[in-house]
Every structure is written in C-alpha cells, then in structure tokens.
Amino acid sequence: MSETISCRQTLAVTSHRVLASDLNEHETVYGGALLSLLDGTASISASRFARSQCVTAALDQVNFIKPFVLNDSLCIESYVTGHGKRSLEVFVKVIGEHLDTGERFLGMTAFLTFVVLDKQVILPELSAETLEEKSLCADFQKREAYRRQKIAEQKKLQASLSLDFPWQS
C-alpha cells in the first residue's frame, strides 16, 4: 500500500519585494522574471511530493491577472494537484500586496508539469483537504487530457519545422 501525502504537505511559499531592477519598460514586473520565480517555488512542491529529482516539463495555463509594481510584495504559493506514474502537476498562485495600503490581490496563476527522473520512484497518493485543493484536484484529469492532446499537436508541428538558418540560404 502506498503512502498518502496531502496537498498541504507539498505547499511551498516564497515572498519577494518588487524592486526597480524587477521592472520592465511598462514599470511592472517583467513576466520572464516572475516565471523564473514561480518555477523555482513549484519545483520545491514537486520535490516534496516525489522525494526525488524532478524537472519542469511544461508550463500551462499561465494567467497574468494583475500587474505587480514597484514596492509591491508578491507571495508565491504552490502545491501538487495531481499526478500520473512519473509526472505531476503543481498549481501556483501569486498573491500581490500593495505594501503602502495592505491591499492584496491575485496577480497570477499557472499549472506546471514536472517529470520524475528516476523511473523506479513510485509516487504517493494525493489527498486534498481545503475547498480550493479539492476543486483543483477534481479537475486534474481534464487538464491532463487537454495536455496530452496539446502534446500530440505539438509533435506534429515539430515534425514540420525547419532547422535551417534562414540567413544561410
């Protein structure tokens, strides 16, 4: 019988203050920098679940909801919401706070897929406790089916792509 781990046991939380060096030309946090931060946090959740080395395989359903600006803080929360034999899904939400007023807001959400490198690892069962966790875990199979469909489409696309450099014709 396999072990059961709760979503809460995979929870990883990181906080960051937005500095001038984080901003793009629109004076909001550069999206690529934010993606790097959330990938790092999500990887902790993946490792807590698998207790093995995992790599990021996909970043899905990235929703930039509200921008982060200078002197905001952002709190990244991630936890596992489903898994297959060697892959697992991590949900990430980024909560912003305007530090001068204390107002909080949902700034971003995303789902990341990680793959366990060690083929011998047997992933534990996952249990959800809160309403949010139960809702996200309940829809895992739908998201997984959609990802599989998109992977098949991506493979067709990749087969048609040229690897020649256009300037060397």
What residue spans do the PLM features occupy?
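Hydrophobic residues in beta-strands and at strand termini
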Residues: 18-19, 64, 114-116
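A positional/architectural concept
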Residues: 2-60
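Hydrophobic beta-strand-centered segment that forms part of the acyl-chain substrate-binding groove
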Residues: 5-9, 43-82, 86-88, 105-109
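HotDog/MaoC-like acyl-thioester-processing domains
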Residues: 8, 12-14, 69-70, 81-169
